[in-house]
Amino acid sequence: MSSARLCSLVAELGYEGAGKLDPDSFEWPFQYDDARPILDWICSSLRPSNVLSLAELSLYEQFQRDGKLLEGDDLDQAYDSISAFSSRRNNQEAVFGAEESIKEVRDATLAHKAEALELQRQLRRLQTQYDLLTGQSSALIQGRRARVAATSAVSGQITAIEDSLSARNLQMNGVLGRLASTSQELAHYHSGEEDGIYLAYSDFHAYLAGDSACTKELNQWFAKQLDTGPYRLVAEEGKSKCSWVSLDDTSNMLRDLEKSQHQRVAELQRLRSIFGTSERQWIEAQVENAKQQAILLTLKSQVTSVEAHIHFDLHSLRRKHADLVEEISTLYQKEEKLLSETIPELCWELAQLQDTYILQGDYDLKVMRQELYISKQKVFINHLVNQLARHQFLKLACQLEKKNMLGAFSLLKVIESELQGYLSATRSRVGRCSALIQAASDVQEQGAVDDRDSFLHGVRDLLSIHSNTQAGLSTYVSAPAIIQQIVALQSDLSSLQSDLENSLPDDRNRCINELCTHIQNLQQLLFASSTTAQPILTPWPLMKELDEMGKINSKLSTAVEEVTLEHRNKREIVKHHAKDVELQRRVFVDFFCNPERLRNQVRELNALVRARQASSS
């Protein structure tokens, strides 16, 4: 809806101003959200039937000058003042045929107002319920988020515990692997299959390589610093004072000093004052290097002594190993001798003493082997028990997580059911509101036809009679609705004519053929000779069914007659009701628009009533 629509409606309604209306000048009120619905309602409600003409305005001003306007601030007080022009109650009843119609209108208005108030209360109650449901849903959502956060925290803790357990499992597997390898090495060592003995000792080669690299770097640095630049003079002077300098260096230094003794005295004094500490540092570095060399020599001597000791220990261990091998061989021989000679004799004697026969064999070896197997099996069983406990713990954690998820799922189902109920209730309320809106629009459309147009009123009454025979309700419709009803009647008439032209002749021919067939069958039954044909008797169950069918047909015909009578009565009631409603509307309109004509009608009715009373008396 825009200003152009408003200007066009005002022009159609007969606005006669100084000039043509400009839509752009009326565009600014439509830009506000508060004023737009009111302007839309005004544009949708503007019609020629509810707009006063110049004659009506002049009549309104005349009523206002004469003081003949209705008294009251609302419609109820206007209803009360409708019969104020008459002074006698009997006269009012004679004029209006009792005031029941006005009371009915007033009661209907009060009922509609009460229903509107009840609907408003229900709407407020639904709004409060909606707010409560919104708060509950928000609380449920927050609870679900808290549960999700707690579940994530618990899952994080479970993951951390699983990681720690897996790390401990790896450590345990490593320890078990080392134990297994150690047991294999011990078994291999005790088996006596290899004669070699392995010993571990400290290796100083890495230390020697690092020390040589450090010494090389120190020598390079000192050579770079003391052989070139001003440090060279300090180094030469320091070398002259050292007793461990070689003769070649001394002779070279003396030759250099003899050549340039006087030039370098001042330079040496200056450099000695500047670089006095460099000589001491270099000497300390040399001393430290000497100490490191001494430590290195000591370590080398220790390494040689350790190697000699290891060599000596190796030779001694080999000698001891040879002695042990000899002792073991003698022990094997003694064992074989005992197993072959002494033990069988002792077993035989023991069997004779106990009256039993004991089989020969290495029982002690079997017992030791069984103990070894049992210990390994215990270790493996402990490992399996730990694995089983870990799996049980994980299973319990999964069950708890599944339980929490099922609880959350059930909670979501409850929320969904509540939301579905609320949605259905909201939809039903929306349907009722739309029905009320439609009813309000229908009520607004009842007075859409101009009251002064008698032709449209007649057409509308005819159509309402036809529609009341079908729907049973009397309504006032607008001109477009009248056109739609006329079009619908035309379509019904065309469909009935097509049925009359197409389907009815076929049905008539089919009925005629069936009647001819029945007549032929009856003729055959009636005129057949007694010698050639026997009478066909109807079975007893069929006779009972035919009697029941006859009773039902009689009841059906009675019901059809009652329905037809009710339809006729209803048509009469609807016909008189339409006349009464038309009379009421005409009286109401004349009261506001043409009260003089209403007074004349009242006088005529009074005269008619008096004449009838006189004739009856």
From Swiss-Prot:
Regions annotated as coiled coil: 107-140, 314-334, 481-504
Tell me the domain of life: Eukaryota
Organism (species): Arabidopsis thaliana
What this protein is reported to do is described as: Involved in microtubules reorganization during spindle and phragmoplast development. Required for gamma-tubulin localization during mitosis.
Please state the protein's primary subcellular location: cytoplasm
Q: How does it assemble?
A: Part of the augmin complex composed of 8 subunits. The complex acts on microtubules and interacts with gamma-tubulin in spindles and the phragmoplast. Interacts with AUG1.
Q: What is this protein called?
A: AUGMIN subunit 3
The record's comment on protein family reads: Belongs to the HAUS3 family.
Sorted UniProt keywords: Cell cycle, Cell division, Coiled coil, Cytoplasm, Cytoskeleton, Microtubule, Mitosis
Q: Which GO terms describe its biological process?
A: cell division; phragmoplast microtubule organization; spindle assembly
* Keyword presence, Transcription: no
Q: Name one Pfam family in it.
A: HAUS-augmin3
- Lineage from the top down? Eukaryota, Viridiplantae, Streptophyta, Embryophyta, Tracheophyta
Provide a GO CC annotation, any one: phragmoplast
- Compartmental location: Cytoplasm, Cytoskeleton, Spindle; Cytoplasm, Cytoskeleton, Phragmoplast
Q: What happens when the gene is disrupted?
A: Lethal when homozygous.
